[in-house]
Amino acid sequence: MTDQRPRAESRSLTAPSLIGTNGHFASVGDAAHDPKAYEHGVQVIDEEKQFNPNLSKYLSLENVANAGFNYHLISVFGSQSTGKSTLLNHLFGTQFSVMSDRERRQTTKGIWMSKNKTKHEDPNARMADNILVMDVEGTDGRERGEDQDFERKSALFALATSEVLIVNIWEHQVGLYQGANMGLLKTVFEVNLQLFLKDKNTTHRSLLFFVIRDFMGTTPLKNLEITLLEDLSRIWASLSKPQGLERSTIHDYFDFAFYGLPHKGYKPEEFAAEAKKLGSRFREGRRDRKEQLIGASIESGVFLPEYHRRIPADGFAHYAEGIWDQIVNNKDLDLPTQQELLAQFRCDEILREVLVAFDEAIVPFEEKQAAGVRAGEPTILGGLGPAMRGARTKAVKNFETEASRYHKGVYQRKRTELEGKIDTRLKALFQGQLNAAHKSGVKDFSDAVSNAVKAGQKKGASYDFAEIVKQETQAALERFEKEARATVVEGTAWSNYKQELKLYQKDLGEVSGQLRRDEMRRLATRVERWVKSRLSHSVSLEFNSLGSGRGGSGAPETGDKPAENKIWDRIWNLFVQTVLDAERRFTDRATSLDASVEEVDVGLWRLRRKSWSVLRLKIEEEMMEGNLLLKLRENFEDKFRYDEAGVPRIWRPTDDIEGVYTRARESTLTLIPLLSKFILAENNSPPPLDRWIGHTPSSATAADEEDLTPIGGVDAEDGRSLEEEMTILNDAKRQDLTVRFKKAADGVYVEAKRSAIGGITQVPLYFYGLLLALGWNEIWAVLRNPAYFFLLFVCAVGAYVTYQLNLWGPMLKMADAASKQALEELKKRLREFLEASDTGRQAMAMSANATGRDAGEEFEMSSLNRGGKKAEDEDENDDI
């Protein structure tokens, strides 16, 4: 009856001297959460061929998983009950179960693993680090009988994973076939050839270390070595070898070492000493090129580099599980494929782990950048460059450290995959950072230029736009390059920002061009306003001078009076001169704006057209029917009411009123046809407007022309000729104006005629006879009295002189003005008197209330322009 194995929770943590079946080890099926269960070791494969999924847990607890390639694996073979576990316990300080002295039965079922526990104080005898020992179920046991399936599978598993295979035999079994485990070794040789066929590029070399137990020394160890090697060579020669390996020898695939141990029961002290000495052999060594057998040097280490399977410790559990899965399912064992699968599995795990750390560093920046994009305000992320470089370097380095130990092809492929994933995300961040720097840089550049221009305008237009653009462009490029350089990740092709820099420069050029065009438009507007102000003043003066055909109040203060028939010549010359001044101002300012020749040509062309439109509107305003009729009447009255010296006429019945009236009227009527068309008196033709404006520049765009008023004789699509453009009054308006003027002139004539004959018709003739009859005595009294006579004489002389000098009119006006002033002064004194008394104040208050009730609203008369809107003064001093 088989002993029942206790539960893991109830096992003793310290193994007793005799244990049935490694009950103190963590076996297949035990829970992985209890670290104490792994104190002594772990069952790798149970007797039912089940692999333990918790092997990686044991390696982690023993601090082997992080050792990389710095670990070694030893397997022990031998017949059942030959002391394999005892040998391992003495060599490596393990606690594998050993057979009881009271009964002989199988104690090791399946494959068990434990880590080396032996520590040597002598540095020269120090064993290698992280030695893992696998105790394999013994062969030729009665429990399995003739079933050699597990024997073959365990041998194949041990050979695929182990560096050193310890063969435990007794001295008296040397030379025997079954007793010396030659059948097992034949199986080992066969599976080794099977592995070679699957991976011809790699020779899987292993060390067969024969430990000869109960060595008495009677037969020299060298002779025993020769016997064993001869037997092994015969077995190798008997194997059916694949094509190309017919002449291969056993030494092409295996190295051999031999060591003899005394009898443990009879010579326990010698056994312990030799076991300790043998244990010191399990260290790392180097092969001498002249050595053929490792046993040639007893003191050399057994762990040679070519024995190592080059499986990283953290992937060994997964690799071993894959190997056993293929073995137990009777599949051809393909170690290269298993190594690639392991590399694929581990590299994927490592890749995910490094990406987790990468996400912790990068995701916050990605979220901030995405939030800015959603808000429509891309944000420059501070510290992005160092974070990107640090995260990428750390991720790649960690992956390289952990994954470079695996299959090189898989490692390189997975590293490329990792770099691709990382670079895809970092590139998006890099592009987003450059995009944010681009947009914010363009905005800052535009604001900086605009602010500098405004500051210059406040200082009196003393700014150089081209210099401002140059300085701000340089500053913007430096800021962009600074941000780009700070975000560059060295060693990546995608972090080259030269193309983005060129695009940024292009956009800055477009923005500066747009700002220059905006400034040019503002300049053009200021110049046009300046032209309008100057023309409004000058043209108004010219039309006001139409009434200066006499020497009165309408005449110029100095110089000769202007010729009325040359009014258009004067207006045209003033217009041309004003526009020339404006062109010089425009050209000077445009040059400071770094405008191109084409832009200046278009600006001057627009300025001339706009200026003509301003002049045309001003002329139409002055030539409005009401304004023109008023000017004609003033011109007529100046010529009719004043003489050539500018002295007002006092009409007498003897004056030639009809002649003066006719001459003044006809002279004024000649102005109507003169003013009806813009014709220069110099050549009796319209001004050369088409040549003066010039052809449309080739660089002008549709936007440059859309706000321009068509001009007859210049724009063919307008359909009007130059003569029509210069026509101010058509025939119908001229006739109507003539009729209305004549009526107004007739009224003035009638008024003058009435004033001339008014003094005579008011005094009847009989009044003079009556005055003479009644005042005869007074007349004689004056004539007889010298004083009265002299006073009368002086008055008569004064009246005559006044009449001759035509001073009666001014004297009467002066008398009238004096009387009005005296009346106002009287009213003022009366008001002051009334305000000084209570009765007067009450009377004034009652009068004011009555006036407020009876009086209607008062309206102020305002001057209107030709469009019927209130005319406002133009600013005549625009700063351009």
UniProtKB/Swiss-Prot annotation:
PROSITE patterns: G_GB1_RHD3. Its main location: endoplasmic reticulum. Residues 784-786 are lumenal. Residues 463-517, 812-839 form a coiled coil. The chain crosses the membrane at residues 763-783, 787-807. Residues 1-762, 808-880 are cytoplasmic. The keyword Transmembrane applies. It comes from the Eukaryota. Residues 68-307 form the GB1/RHD3-type G domain. Keywords: Coiled coil, Endoplasmic reticulum, GTP-binding, Hydrolase, Membrane, Nucleotide-binding, Transmembrane, Transmembrane helix. GO terms for biological process: endoplasmic reticulum membrane fusion. It holds the Pfam family Sey1_3HB. Gene3D superfamilies: P-loop containing nucleotide triphosphate hydrolases. Belongs to the TRAFAC class dynamin-like GTPase superfamily. GB1/RHD3 GTPase family. RHD3 subfamily. This is Protein sey1. The lineage of its organism: Eukaryota, Fungi, Dikarya, Ascomycota, Pezizomycotina.
